[in-house]
Amino acid sequence: MKLNLLLLLAFLSTTTIFNLKAQSTFKLKETGYVGALSANATADWTTGWTNFDPKNAVYGAPTDTTTLNGMLSTLTVIGEKDITTTVTLDATKVYLLKGFVVVRSGGKLIIPEGTVIRAQSDLNSTPKNYASLVVERGGKIEITGTSTKPVVITSAKAVGQRERGDWGGLLIAGKAPHNLLDGTTNNNVQMEGFNNVTFDANLAKFGGTDANDNSGIVRYLRLEFGGLAFEVNKEINGLTLGGVGAGTELNHVQVSFANDDSFEWFGGNVNSTHLIAWKGTDDDFDTDNGYSGLNQFGIGVRDSVYYDGTYAAASSPSTSEGFESDNEATGTANVTPYTSAVFSNYTMIGPVPVGAKYADINSVTKAAFRRGARIRRNSSQRIVNSIFMGYRNFVMIDGDSSVRNTNYPSALTLVTPSTAVDVKSKQISFANNLIVNTTSAYTTAGDTTANGLIEVARATGSNAKLTALDAWLRQTGVLANKIDPVAFTAGTVLVEPLASSTAPNFRPVAGSPALSGANFKDNPVLNNLFTDTKEIKAAQVAPIYPNPITNGSLFFGRQVVSYGIFDMSGRLVKHGFDTDQAEINNLTKGLYFVKLDGKVQKLIVQ
């Protein structure tokens, strides 16, 4: 035994000589509270770097008008400026962003703490000035703001003149999998709006097979007034992530006044923490085409003044949601990877102000804003340990494929096929959430599709589905949601969650139901996605094989709901769902811990 231990220690001591490959350093943190914040003021992660009144923020005039200027007449292709080497910005300067600035494969853009970039677009120029920052596959961006010196990318307009859509946005294209097809592959799908960029037909294509792909670091960043409409009804999101892999670091990002979605993921599996969507236009957090990352601690706040103007369009109307999630466009194709992202500890504030009723808001707001979460088109989205308040309806399970993904017995009898999804890892999870305001939300006599809590698609049998899914959300037990435990009035849940405030406070008040109710260990989706040092110390050898392993597949010997692989500090470096194996080709040599069915086993990669 002593000899084996010495050999193990000797092996571990040699692992430091190998070059580190990019891999996820994400770890879910177990909390007792639900929502984004605890009651502890000193632990308020929104302090120092956020700005909830960017229309009136004072920023310096640009002092560098060339480094990030894609409209210079001296460029080979006017309209875009390529970064092919390492370019490091200087935080003592204020940069003007015009045209596309494109970080090509092999290039790197480093934006240090405290840097301010002011963006100016012009779709009437020739060529068009799209004022956007694009990171291509193989390129890297390193945004390294801090809690006291964030990086800010904002409008170039003056105080009081800034508005949604003043510039494009930040778009990152990675090599991770998604479920869109481009002919026979999924490696060259182009982001929306770029197909008619006349001077570069191949810009912003994403996808590949590297789930651990590394596009860089995005840390302590504010994105303000993005969402330029490249074409009619084709606005750019505040932050767009296409096929971005788990090797990318993403945390502490505030998107304010986006002219489309604040955040949107197209496939990929990048993990994140501490995201804020402030007064966006369409959806706060939109997941599509096989996105399967883990996300913890986030805030979404709606203002009734800002909504998607196509809500009443005769063709393809779009309403503004908190979460919107799709697997693929039809909702019927069984394409993989599945959209199965996890969002835990989110605080979602709808357009109905605290103390008001849905009936009190104007008719346009009633029509434009709909749900706290819309899960549709065969998505398996998971939203847990979160707060929802002030919405018209709180959850919509839209379409039979997503109704089936609930695996709720009385709902399964109403869809075809009526069998449960193959394994529970494809099952939607909406559990341990605090939901406030259903009794004063949307109600209308005789409506068979919505009741203020749950909504279903308008179709044959909608009333039966509504009844079944209402029961699904009201299940009791360790995964129960708290529904209307307190009145929707000031001082019952959060300190100051109003969108009208320029200094909101999303911490729970004394006695708030948000102070408790989170559950990680009993949720079959979550219980393999976090660990602690006690579990690592108590790890016992179990029959995963081969072990040790050099590369290829690690086999579990059975199908598992989910798995997590952790490094020695307890950081989650790889995870997956609905599988009997894990690919470990991109793991650095060393000692790891694999968690299956709530139990931890040692793994050596050599």
Residue ranges and their predicted role:
Residues 21, 82, 90, 96, ...:
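Short, solvent-exposed coil/turn segments
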Residues 1-24, 531-533, 555, 591-600:
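Bacterial Sec-dependent N-terminal signal peptides
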Residues 15-17, 86, 532-534, 551, ...:
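N-terminal compositionally biased, intrinsically disordered segments and leader/signal-like regions
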Residues 21, 513, 569-571:
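Residue-level recognition of short loop/turn positions
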Residues 536-606:
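C-terminal outer-membrane/trafficking sorting elements
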Residues 8-12, 20, 117, 536-540, ...:
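N-terminal cationic amphipathic segment used for targeting or macromolecule association
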Residues 23-530:
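Beta-strand/loop edge motif enriched in small/polar residues
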